């Protein structure tokens, strides 16, 4: 397991970015972060809902030049 990871899901439509992020979070240690890069505008709403439902913390959500960047912390941090 790693302390942090980046997942590039640019070009994919929802729900694929959230599904792939959920799978990627299993590969990072509890308390570690996953940065997700997406281009689907619906991803902002989807990642907020995903965070609420799963308990993974959405640390930030930003957009720059059409790329959405989400930073999630895997639940279970010490």
Stretches with model-predicted labels:
Residues 9-61:
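Amphipathic, hydrophobic secondary-structure cores in small proteins
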Residues 62-63, 76:
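Short, low-complexity Ser/Thr-rich regulatory SLiMs
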Residues 65-67:
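Short acidic/glycine-enriched loop/turn segments that link adjacent beta-strands
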Residues 70-78:
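Core SAM-dependent methyltransferase catalytic element
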Residues 2-10:
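Short amphipathic
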């Amino acid at each position: 397991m790693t302390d942090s990871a980046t997942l590039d899901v640019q070009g994919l439509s929802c729900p694929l970015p959230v599904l792939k992020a959920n799978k990627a979070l299993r590969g990072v240690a509890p308390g570690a972060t996953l940065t997700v890069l997406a281009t689907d505008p619906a991803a902002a709403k989807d990642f907020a809902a995903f965070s609420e439902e799963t308990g993974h913390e959405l640390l930030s959500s930003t957009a720059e030049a059409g790329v959405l960047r989400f930073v999630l912390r895997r639940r279970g941090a010490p």
